[in-house]
């Protein structure tokens, strides 16, 4: 649609936002601690192995990684409260569904911060389950194009037929491959082994349908809500079903 944008095309990942705020080490450390509860051996704990690999790619020092693992296993010795994974749901302007995943050591503080962000930006923090059914939880692997010509779609399709992929989308950087929630390790390992440049991988909430906003003021307020949520320290990811909306002046990409 001419003159319109899509949230999926302009959204900034939480990793980019955190890097600008200097909080990426803290966030990745929390993810490692939470994953380590299922076992401190990354060889037998895919979630921990994934968190460690992402931390190393971001330049997190080995000592920080080891401390995060120890804390998750209860061996940190600092007496601090453990972080827990919590999912919050709500609505933004125009009825846009918003799903927020957090890593928090204080539910009351986190809920208060989220409620304030929603209320200040035309939204409402809802009850658990109010919008979750509007999303599917799937595996996603981002690929970087390794040549100026971009992704070789024929080669990618051939490889995806051998893996548990449901499909792919071309992106500015390369391609986004997606598959069932349980197929993340198979997908990212398989793509690496076949020579693809894997940029990122993880589980994401994907909207089953989208809501288009046709009023500029409403769209701007919705984007402000999403950015306010992403800026909170406890927030791990923000997903929504915002579709197309009018081009906005001074829109940041």
Curated annotation (Swiss-Prot):
Q: Name one Pfam family in it.
A: TACO1_YebC_N
UniProt key word DNA-binding: yes
Q: Family assignment? A: Belongs to the TACO1 family.
User: PANTHER family recorded for this chain?
Assistant: TRANSCRIPTIONAL REGULATORY PROTEIN YEBC-RELATED, TRANSLATIONAL ACTIVATOR OF CYTOCHROME C OXIDASE 1
Chief location: cytoplasm
Localisation per UniProt entry: Cytoplasm
Question: What are the entry keywords?
Answer: Cytoplasm, DNA-binding, Transcription, Transcription regulation
Per its UniProt record, what InterPro entries does this chain match?
Integrase-like_N (IPR017856), TACO1_YebC-like_2nd/3rd_dom (IPR048300), TACO1_YebC_N (IPR049083), Transcrip_reg_TACO1-like (IPR002876), Transcrip_reg_TACO1-like_dom3 (IPR026564), YebC-like (IPR029072)
Where on the tree of life does the source sit, at the highest rank? Answer: Bacteria
What is an example of a GO molecular function annotated in this UniProt entry? DNA binding
List GO BP terms, alphabetically: regulation of DNA-templated transcription
Protein name per its UniProtKB record: Probable transcriptional regulatory protein SynRCC307_1833
Which organism is this protein's natural source?
Synechococcus sp. (strain RCC307)
Gene Ontology cellular component list: cytosol
């Amino acid at each position: 649609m001419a003159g319109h944008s899509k949230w999926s095309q302009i959204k900034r990942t939480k990793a980019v936002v955190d890097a600008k705020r200097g909080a990426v080490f803290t966030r990745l450390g929390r993810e490692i601690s939470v994953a380590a509860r299922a076992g401190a051996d990354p060889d037998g704990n895919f979630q921990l192995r994934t968190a460690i690999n992402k931390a190393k790619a971001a330049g997190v020092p080995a000592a920080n990684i080891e401390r995060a693992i120890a804390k998750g296993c209860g061996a940190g010795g600092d007496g601090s409260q453990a972080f827990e994974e919590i999912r919050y749901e709500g609505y933004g302007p125009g009825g846009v569904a918003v799903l927020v995943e957090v890593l928090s050591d204080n539910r009351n503080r986190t809920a208060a911060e989220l409620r304030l962000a929603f209320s200040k930006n035309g939204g409402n923090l809802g009850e658990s389950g109010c919008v979750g059914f509007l999303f599917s939880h799937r595996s996603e692997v981002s690929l970087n194009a390794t040549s100026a010509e971009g992704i070789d779609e024929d080669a990618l399709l051939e490889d995806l037929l051998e893996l548990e992929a449901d499909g792919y989308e071309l992106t500015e950087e390369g391609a986004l491959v997606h598959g069932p929630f349980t197929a993340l390790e198979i997908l990212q390992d398989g793509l690496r082994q076949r020579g693809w440049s894997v940029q990122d991988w993880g589980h994401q909430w994907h909207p089953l349908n989208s809501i288009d906003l046709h009023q500029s003021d409403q769209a701007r307020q919705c984007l402000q809500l999403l950015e306010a949520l992403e800026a909170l320290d406890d927030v791990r990811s923000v997903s929504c079903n915002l579709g197309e909306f009018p081009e906005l002046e001074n829109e940041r990409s």
